[in-house]
Each structure stands twice: as C-alpha cells, then as structure tokens.
C-alpha cells in the first residue's frame, strides 16, 4: 500500500448506511453497525456465492462416494458449511477493505466502506478478521483432516487475492479458485477422495467450472466500477474486456457447460443431471447475457442477478437428483 494515505472523502465520513436505518437491520446497536458493514451483512448475495460450491461438493461427494452419505449427515454438514461460509466471507471482506482502503476512497461505490471512511481502524479490522477465521475453522472442526488443509489453502488465497488487483487483470480467477476449493473440501467431507483416481478428472472439471462461474459473477458485478477503476488503476477482467463483455461471458458460459457435461459423462450421471445442471444452467446464463447485451439489465442489481441464481439452482438441482437416486434415505441410515 502507498506510504501516503488517500484522504477520506468528506461525504463518506458522515455516511449512514440506509439499510441499517430501517427494517430488520435497524435493531443492531449503532456501535456494531460498522463491523456488520465490514462483513457485508446487508449484502447476502456474497454468502450465496460462497456457499453454493459447498453444496455442489457435498452432493457430488455424497452421490459419487462408494460409502453413501446418509441424509442426516448431509444435512449436518450443510449446516456446518453455512457457518464456515459466513465467517470466512466476513474475514475476507474485512481483509479486502484493509488492503484496498486507498483504492476504495477513489471509487464512488466503495468510499463509504467502514475502513475507507474511517469508521473502523485498520487494526480493529484485522483483529475482527482474525476472529472470523477462528470461528470459521471451529465450524469445520468435526470434518476430516483434508478439510482443514483445504480450508487453510482457501485462507491463503483469500489473503493473496486483494493484492492481485494491483498486478494482473485476472484477479477474478484467484477469487474463483478461492471459492472453488470449497467444492473439493465438501467432497472430502462427504467421504469422497476427490483428487484421487478415478475422481481426479471429474473433480478438476467441476472445480474449474465453479471457478469460471465466480469469474462470470464478478465480471458482471464489477462492470459498475469500470470508470472509477480506470482512473484509479485497479485491474480486472471487467476493465480489460470492457468493450467485449458479452463475448467474454458467452465464452465462459460455453466452457462451463462443457465442463459440467464432461463430468456427467465421466461419472455416469443420469439424464436429469444433463437437463438441469447442463441445459438449465446454460439457458439461464445465456438469457442473462442477452439481457445485458440488449440493455434489459443495466446493473447487477436488476433482474440479471436472479438469472444467475437460477443458473446455480439448476446446477444444484441436477446434483440433488443424482443424490436422491443413489443415497439411502434417513430412515435407512
């Protein structure tokens, strides 16, 4: 980070987040609000993005593993991953705000973040982040040792990610890898030796597909900051491909569908998997791209986000059907 801090914007210093002024979040004590903002409590879509790889990995591992995981254990692990995702996302957001505070002060959307506007000090944000990581690892402590090691890998990549935006336009790939590793983590939690033969290739295919799904999300989300990023020097795929976004997103979508289809063939999934996880996902993402292309969706906050969610639900739906077809029910566990 530069030696001379970018000054806090006068309007940002007096900012009050409207999401905490009314509605359910208004009950939070005012002194806690900056820390809730630090972990993006008011923006739950990030938890959805971080959580879905765990569900895919859990269902993939549960249905592909020779030792079928019963429904009650699947439900138990799914709850563990909610906590892991929530706390790791909070830690990641806090660290990102610490590292990016100077860039954030130059970006209209980001200059009101708690560290950038001075509501939370750098030291306090770091302590908060460490506490979140400790709570996250407590959540996955009942899982196999491989899960702890993969969790550590996720943590290291989360630390590296904010710095990547300074040196490469492909920081989104690092972010995607960070979240996609949780797919492998959850597969191991389900008892599947995910990176050992004969599961190595299908695991790599799905991990790559999830990485690209995160890249897709972040490129669309980052488009709103392109003008500010060009001024401040922040790198990213939304900046690099700003004149060819639809071509980039279409290419990513086709590769994702191809990788998921390849996985289905390799592990001998049934026809409903291809209907939902391949065709359904493909249709939802292409519809989203079409909406962006023809200016139906001007921002991520429009209906485009729902098409992305539909794509993810289709992906999960195919794996859920595979699980229900192959795994013993709760009363037979």
From Swiss-Prot:
Recorded catalytic activity of this chain's protein: orsellinate + (2E,6E)-farnesyl diphosphate = ilicicolinate B + diphosphate
Any one cellular-component term (Gene Ontology): mitochondrial inner membrane
EC number: 2.5.1.-
GO molecular function (one): 4-hydroxybenzoate polyprenyltransferase activity
Lineage top rank: taxon: Eukaryota
Location of the protein in the cell: Membrane
The keyword Magnesium belongs to this UniProt entry's keyword annotation: yes
Keyword hit for Transmembrane: yes
Pfam families: UbiA
Keywords, sorted A to Z: Magnesium, Membrane, Transferase, Transmembrane, Transmembrane helix
TM region positions: 74-94, 125-145, 147-164, 173-193, 201-221, 247-267, 272-292, 304-324
Membrane topology label: Multi-pass membrane protein
UniProt GO BP: terpenoid biosynthetic process; ubiquinone biosynthetic process
Signal peptide feature range: none
Metabolic or biological pathway, per its Swiss-Prot or TrEMBL entry: Secondary metabolite biosynthesis; terpenoid biosynthesis
Family named by the database record: Belongs to the UbiA prenyltransferase family.
Function in brief: Prenyltransferase; part of the cluster that mediates the biosynthesis of LL-Z1272-beta, also known as ilicicolin B, a prenylated aryl-aldehyde produced by several fungi and that serves as a key pathway intermediate for many fungal meroterpenoids. The first step in the pathway is performed by the non-reducing polyketide synthase stbA that produces orsellinic acid by condensing acetyl-CoA with 3 malonyl-CoA units. The prenyltransferase stbC then prenylates orsenilic acid into grifolic acid. Finally, grifolic acid is reduced to ilicicolin B by the NRPS-like protein stbB.
Protein name as catalogued: Prenyltransferase stbC
Organism expressing this protein natively: Stachybotrys bisbyi (Hyalostachybotrys bisbyi)
